[in-house]
């Protein structure tokens, strides 16, 4: 992903078809890598930051998911470059302090049920959401891909 972004930035790759990396359990991966090799983990986090900073203009996108964010794996600079931030589940002050600090007052005291939470668009538009429960995931996937 990082090499594809650099090829687009340098002009070597002139294509603009969207490229998206979905990284499930990002925090767990980064923390495990940091336990093995802190320098390598820092290199990976710097590359993630660069993808977030430069990727949008070249149609290179990164989607990460995690059970609970950790400041170690989300340096302040990279946190600011996520275009869409979704938080599902119970209000945890530390999560909102890290990912949506300007919107804590709007969320504080609110109770979220299963599949409910917030979405922050481009750092300014906060919305309350509910992800619907579905029993036909396979059918939805087939429909989305056709």
Regions inferred by a protein language model and the residue ranges of each:
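Mechanochemical coupling/switch segment within NTP-driven translocation systems
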Residues: 1-23
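Conserved ATP-driven motor cores of ASCE-family P-loop NTPases powering translocation/secretion/packaging/pilus
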Residues: 64-145
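Substrate-engagement module of ASCE P-loop NTPases
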Residues: 1-4, 41-64, 91
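Short beta-strand segments at enzyme active-site cores
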Residues: 20-22, 62-66
């Amino acid at each position: 992903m990082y090499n594809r972004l650099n090829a687009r930035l340098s002009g070597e790759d002139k294509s603009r078809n969207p490229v998206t990396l979905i990284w499930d359990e990002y925090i767990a991966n980064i923390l495990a890598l940091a336990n093995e090799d802190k320098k390598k983990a820092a290199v990976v986090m710097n590359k993630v930051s660069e993808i977030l900073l430069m990727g949008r203009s070249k149609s290179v996108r990164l989607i990460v998911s995690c059970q609970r964010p950790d400041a170690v794996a989300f340096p302040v600079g990279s946190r600011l470059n996520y275009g869409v931030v979704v938080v599902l589940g119970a209000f945890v002050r530390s999560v909102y302090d890290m990912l949506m600090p300007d919107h804590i007052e709007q969320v504080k005291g609110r109770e979220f049920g299963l599949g409910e939470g917030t979405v922050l668009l481009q750092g300014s538009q906060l919305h309350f959401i509910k992800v619907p429960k579905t029993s036909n995931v396979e059918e939805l996937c087939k429909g989305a891909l056709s």
